[in-house]
Amino acid sequence: IIECVFSCDIEKEGKPCKPKGEKKCSGGWKCKIKLCLKI
């Protein structure tokens, strides 16, 4: 799990990078700048 520096509600492939209100990325996603990356 990688800490995000901003609310990452950016969508990729039609799915949210992380749920609204969450402070950390989960589900194999991480936030990088304004991109959601699968790790």
Curated annotation (Swiss-Prot):
Keywords noted in UniProt: Disulfide bond, Neurotoxin, Secreted, Toxin
Cellular localization per UniProt: Secreted
Pfam families in the cross-refs: Toxin_20
Signal peptide: none
GO cellular component annotations of the record: extracellular region
Superkingdom of the source species: Eukaryota
Primary subcellular site in the record, as a coarse category: secreted
Tissue specificity of this protein: Expressed by the venom gland.
GO MF term (any one): toxin activity
Disulfide bridges in this chain: C4-C25, C8-C31, C17-C36
Matches recorded under SUPFAM superfamilies: omega toxin-like (SSF57059)
Family as reported in the entry's similarity comment: Belongs to the neurotoxin 12 (Hwtx-2) family. 06 (TXP1) subfamily.
Function statement: Inhibits voltage-gated calcium channels (Cav) in rat cerebellar granule cells. Has insecticidal activity.
Miscellaneous section: The primary structure of the mature peptide is identical to that of Eurypelma spider toxin 2 from Aphonopelma californicum (AC P61510).
Name used for this protein in its record: Omega-theraphotoxin-Bs1b
